Swiss-Prot record:
Keywords: Cytoplasm, Heme biosynthesis, Metal-binding, Oxidoreductase, Porphyrin biosynthesis. PANTHER family: COPROPORPHYRINOGEN III OXIDASE, MITOCHONDRIAL, OXYGEN-DEPENDENT COPROPORPHYRINOGEN-III OXIDASE, MITOCHONDRIAL. This is Oxygen-dependent coproporphyrinogen-III oxidase. GO terms for cellular component: cytoplasm. NCBIfam families: PRK05330.1 (NF003727). Its EC number is 1.3.3.3. It comes from the Bacteria. One of its GO terms (biological process) is protoporphyrinogen IX biosynthetic process.
Length: 299
């Protein structure tokens, strides 16, 4: 079937609405919407919830950009795309809670198509979801990964193991030699066996995010925390910033295509701290995190 970018866009707009509504229902605060246009073509709508009852900052961004030439970040590993016009659309979100016992979560789903006269379009889907805890709870990790596995199951037994490994490999801070969190799913360049199958999988990932995350929020939101936990949360948020600015391909793509900087950097935590050569106290809950985020089979 010929790729149908219009249907993908309509799903993404509905997905943004659905996720924002569910996050607001849990938090009690509302999102503020900021619609924007891109001079070179396209635009989007960024929605941010700040200083809510549970979420310090939650950003859910929809973007749809297009142009006459591919950016360098996209053609570096796909040289056959040079000289093609392109459309890129997606929903990307990051949620940073107040409570350090609630993990930070990230998800995104996206569609890309590049065309030129006289040639078949080149298209693919990408996306995923991943979880970044500050204090590890095994039941939360198991729930997160079980939900990820279950949404993959209709598409084949090998889908979850493959995309879990890809997620573990992708969200790795090489300069720190550590994982960003406990992973989840990551996929890119998905265009087989056909458009309908790939689109259905992308929808399953997008719709699965709130099923994976919100039960964890409900389970942890009443836990009492203090200055010690907050300081550790801010310190670990530094790793999040480092990954996004140094390693994340999506951030690089957005900046290279003249995307909207405020929306691209919306994933950044509102507060963060670095401390030179800080080490957690041996045997402490903070020290346990480094072991908790090691790659493993959670289910």
């Amino acid at each position: 079937m010929k790729p149908d970018a219009h249907h993908v866009k309509q799903f993404l707009l509905r997905l943004q609405d659905d996720i924002c509504q569910k996050l607001s229902a849990v938090d009690g605060a509302n999102f503020v919407e900021d619609s924007w246009r891109r001079e070179a073509g396209g635009g989007g709508r960024s929605r941010v919830l700040r200083n809510g009852g549970i979420f310090e900052q939650a950003g859910v961004n929809f973007s749809h950009v297009h142009g006459d030439a591919m950016p360098a970040s996209a053609t570096a590993h796909r040289p056959e795309l040079a000289g093609r016009s392109f459309e890129a659309m997606g929903v990307s979100l990051v949620v940073h809670p107040h409570n350090p016992y609630i993990p930070t979560s990230h998800a995104n789903v996206r569609f890309f198509i590049a065309e030129k006269p006289g040639a078949d379009p080149v298209w693919w889907f990408g996306g995923g979801l991943d979880l970044t805890p500050y204090y590890g709870f095994e039941e939360d990790a198991v729930h997160w990964h079980r939900t990820a596995r279950d949404l993959c199951q209709p598409f084949g037994d090998n889908v979850y193991p493959r995309y879990k490994k890809w997620c573990d490999d992708y969200f790795f801070l090489k300069h720190r030699n550590e994982q960003r969190g406990i992973g989840g799913l990551f996929f890119d360049d998905l265009n087989t066996p056909d458009f309908d199958h790939c689109f259905a999988f992308m929808q399953a990932v997008g719709n699965g995010y709130t099923e994976a995350y919100l039960p964890i929020v409900e389970r942890r939101k009443a836990m009492v925390w203090g200055e010690r936990e907050r300081n550790f949360q801010l310190y670990r948020r530094g790793r999040y910033v480092e990954f996004n600015l140094v390693w994340d391909r999506g951030t690089l793509f957005g900046l290279q295509t003249g995307g909207r900087t405020e929306s691209i950097l919306m994933s950044m935590p509102p507060l963060v701290r670095w401390e030179y050569d800080w080490q957690p106290e041996a045997g402490s809950p903070e020290a346990a995190l480094s072991e908790f985020i090691q790659v493993r089979d959670w289910i």
